Every structure is written in C-alpha cells, then in structure tokens.
Amino acid sequence: MSAGRTFAFAICILEVSVLTAGPTPNYAPEPEQQSGTPLPIDCRMSSWSEWSECDPCLRQMFRSRSIEVFGQFNGQRCVDAVGDRRQCVPTEACEEVEDDCGNDFQCGTGRCIKKRLLCNGDNDCGDFSDEDDCENDPRPPCRERVVEESELARTAGYGINILGMDPLSTPFDNEYYNGLCDRVRDGNTLTYYRKPWNLASLAYETKADKNFRIEHYEQQIQAFRSVIEERRSHFNADFTLKFTPTEAKKCKQEPEESCNGTDSSENRIFRFAYSKNETYQLFLSYSSKKEKMFLHVKGVIQLGKFVMRSRDVVLTTTFLDDIKALPTAYEKGEYIAFLETYGTHYSSSGSLGGLYELIYVLDKASMDQKGVELRDIQRCLGFNLDLSLKDKYEVTAKIDKNDCLKRNEKEIVNIMDGSLIDDVISLIRGGTRKYAFELKEKLLKGAKTVNVTDFVNWASSLNDAPVLISQRLSPIYNLIPVKMKDAHQKKQNLERAIEDYINEFSVRKCHPCQNGGTVIQIDGQCLCSCPIAFEGIACETGKKKIS
C-alpha cells in the first residue's frame, strides 16, 4: 500500500517518544475500602461583591466573585463566570475623546489613514470606506505584478493563553498593507506573496530534518508532563489547564458571529484543533490498572518564519473597541474576559506550520503475550519510514501491508486486529477542514490504523491553514496604544488581571490526592494521576501484585 502527496514545507520533524510504565508487575484491585473513597466535592464560589458605581461612558456596572474550591472526585466542576455586568443610568457625564485625524482621512471605522491610500483597491480602512466615492479606476499598489495573500502572514502574531486555551481572536489587522507592495517569494511553489504592513519580516524557508526519540516513563504523570512541556517551559506553570472560555460572553452567546476581529467570510480558512479538554481527560482516564504503553508520535512541519513590527502596528477595530470598552477601574471579570478573547500574550516572532501529534495507547500485556515488540508496531504504522524532501518537494510514504504481520512460534499475529492498540488520542493542530475532518471521522469510528499515510495527507493541506508552532511571546498589554484614553491605567489593570487569572484557576484550590498522586486541574475540575501501585478517583485504592 502506498500514498504520495506533493507539498511545500520548511521543516519536517517526525518525533517518536515512548511513554510507558516500564517493566512493572501487573496489579489487581484489593477489596474496595469505602472509608478511603472520598465523597464528591462540588464547585464552590464566593459571594458576589457589591455592584460597582455606574461607569458613565460604558453605562454599565460590574461585580465579581472568586472560585474557592474546584469540583473534584466526581463532583460538579466550575463552569460559571467570575464576573457579571448590568446596564445602569450614570449620574456623571462621560468625558469622551473624539478621534481627530487632522489632515488624514477618517474611515467609517474611526481609523485614520493617509489620503494617498484612497481609491487604491486595498481595504485600508477595514470597511472599504476608503474605496467609496472613487471617480477613476483604482490604482493598485502592485500594478501588474502578480501577488497572492499569504495565509502564513494572516496567522502571524496570533496570541497564546497562559493556561493553555487557544485565543478566540487576533489583535492584528494583517490585511493592511499601507499602500506598499512588498513581495515575498516561496521558493517551493515559486509563488509571490504580499507581505502585510504589520510584519517586519516574513520568510518561506525550505529545510528538512528528522528526529526519532524514544523515552520511557514509569508513571502516567511523567507522560502527561511530556505532552504539556511546551506550555510549562514558556510560563513555568503548574498543572492547571483551561481550554473553555467562561468569561468571553460575546463569543459564547453568539456562536454564529465572527470572533476574529475581522469580517466573516465564506472563504475563511478553517484551522482545525480537537477539543483539548476531552483529549486530556481521555488521556488521564487510562490508569495503570493494566500495564500500558503510550506511543507518542509527533510530527512538526514548519512552513516559514515571521517577525512582527515593534511599533506602528495596525490593530483591528474590534481589538481597539474592546480596549475602549474595558472599565478604567479594575473589574476582574471584564479584564479576564479580554484575556480569554485575545490571549495573555501575543507572538512577536515565531514559526508557522502544523503540529501532528498522536498518542497510541498500547496494551503491554497483549504485546507480551503475542510476542509483539514496540518496533513492530512502529513499522506497521509506518513511523520508521524516511520522510525526506525530493525534487519538486514530493514526499512519498510506502507502507507494506506485510509489515503489520508478526510471526511467532505459534501463529501469525495481525498487529491491527484491535487487541494491541487500545485507543488513538489526537492532539493535532493545523490543516484544512477536509483532511482534519477525515481523520477525526476515522478516529470517531474507532479506527486504530492512523498511520504515516494520514500524516502525508494532512501535511499537504498546511499551506492553506497554518498555525503557530513556536513563538517568542510578549504580554498582550504592550499593544495598548499609548495615545488612547486611560491607556496607562488599563495597561496596569491587564498586568494585574494576568496575575489574578493564574491565581483564580490555580491547582492550589484542589484537594490533594492520596498515596503520592498528582492533582491536575482541567476546566474547573480536579483530577488525580496515580502512581503505578494505586488507582481510584483519589488514588485511594492499592493494587496487589498478581503472582
């Protein structure tokens, strides 16, 4: 069986890690001890604060509360907002500051642009108001030169959330060009792309590298650490993960509306990501009741690199309006809602591409019984193949169906018969709807033959839907324009909000696990990852060795 796909990319890293309990004995549960099983703990929140004074400009008042204890041991998790608002009639007048564009043109969005940008065919205003009332044909900056819009450039600068959630929107208007026609050539496809104003540099680079790594872990928590290591290395964070927004009300209540800071479009590229909450909970649900081995397959494809401008960046009208809508007096709920929408940090530079990451849950006992080794499974899935760039950037993966047959003394074992691979957990990021949904559909149907062919298919779609795969981060509050009203105060408030955000959802609000278990907080619920010799919702049940 073979599959071939042609696609352009910069770096292809196929990394295989083995996360395993090692050569540990099998255990069976001892008789249940009811006294050791903790009762469910429901989410507990503090009382609401008093309502704030009525903000004269926003015509709203606010209140907040805190999470005291997260749900744990099958109790109700914390899913409600910590902030609240309501309309009010102010008793003071609002001191509004009108935008003055001077000799420049004022857009319908309020943006100020140079008059030389009028009637050039570009959407410099963001609402095309600069292209109204044009008597003559547009004067496009690129004239007769052929250029295309870059999906890498559109994605550049996207934010990251310190607790792991993908931001709902981007602050940058990367479809603004300031009347320039800076072209960047993709050496793979020989296509010229137009570089947006916000990017100081954009490079399509072509490199190829492969790295195979095998590691063994004796406890599940060590496997979990390896999966979330990137986020922890960025922020020195504890085991707290939050993937579901609870404060960004606009995007929750109006799912059909665009939360991207730009107009919705039928042609908008879909960037796929599986539900991280469900994925991590599924991963943690595999206890050490039976000896498991986790085959961690990671393929990183880098398409290019970018560096954002350090000053004079053009931000989306939505981002600026949301900053203006923040109360000058600190209100925890409102500022956390802003962080959940745009991220706690943005990418000042980084790499774009896709992350192909799967975790195969292997049944170690069945492998031993049938004489199947780890390298046999790797060979069957095709992850021992060389993936190297050839002429015209063709990547071909050839899988022999006989590689999935293992002969032992008694029989011929089919590795794909279902008894060796318990599950496939996906952490894939990037790629278009077509290949991402095909793979998701395959997993939902219980397929356990996700292999290198699926990797090649997915990789071929990344040019159209890249995501950030590595970045240098800067706090989101650094983007507040210094000339905006109350800019200094709101910057200080956002600094405070990031600290409050970390403390509000800290794992310290969980009860400890028993017998050396590690507590992990995911989306308002505390879970226990148990050592090899224990199991249960609190690691309260010991396992006796099976002779």
UniProtKB/Swiss-Prot annotation:
Top-level taxonomic group: Eukaryota
Source organism (scientific name): Equus caballus
Cysteine disulfide links: C43-C78, C54-C88, C57-C94, C101-C112, C107-C125, C119-C134, C142-C181, C380-C404, C510-C526, C513-C528, C530-C539
Family membership noted in the UniProt record: Belongs to the complement C6/C7/C8/C9 family.
InterPro entries hit by this protein: Growth_fac_rcpt_cys_sf, LDL_receptor-like_sf, LDLR_class-A_CS, LDrepeatLR_classA_rpt, MAC_perforin, MACPF, MACPF_CS, TSP1_rpt
Localization of this protein: Secreted; Target cell membrane
Ranges for domain TSP type-1: 42-95
Any GO BP: killing of cells of another organism
Subunit structure, as described in the record: Homooligomer; about 20 C9 chains oligomerize to give rise to a huge beta-barrel that forms a 100 Angstrom diameter pore in target membranes. Component of the membrane attack complex (MAC), composed of complement C5b, C6, C7, C8A, C8B, C8G and multiple copies of the pore-forming subunit C9.
Bilayer disposition of the protein: Multi-pass membrane protein
TM ranges: 235-242, 265-272, 374-381, 382-390
Database matches in SMART domains: LDLa, MACPF, TSP1
Domain MACPF: 138-509
Positions glycosylated per UniProt: N260, N277, N451
Domain LDL-receptor class A: 99-136
Keywords: Complement alternate pathway, Complement pathway, Cytolysis, Disulfide bond, EGF-like domain, Glycoprotein, Immunity, Innate immunity, Membrane, Membrane attack complex, Secreted, Signal, Target cell membrane, Target membrane, Transmembrane, Transmembrane beta strand
All copies of domain EGF-like, residue ranges: 510-540
Inhibition and activation profile: Membrane attack complex (MAC) assembly is inhibited by CD59, thereby protecting self-cells from damage during complement activation. CD59 acts by preventing incorporation of the multiple copies of C9 required for complete formation of the osmolytic pore. MAC assembly is also inhibited by clusterin (CLU) chaperones that inhibit polymerization of C9.
Signal sequence coordinates: 1-21
UniProt entry tagged with the keyword 4Fe-4S: no
One GO cellular component term noted in the UniProt record for this chain: other organism cell membrane
PTMs per UniProt: Phosphorylation sites are present in the extracellular medium.
PANTHER family linked to this entry: COMPLEMENT COMPONENT C6, COMPLEMENT COMPONENT C9
Protein name from the UniProt record: Complement component C9
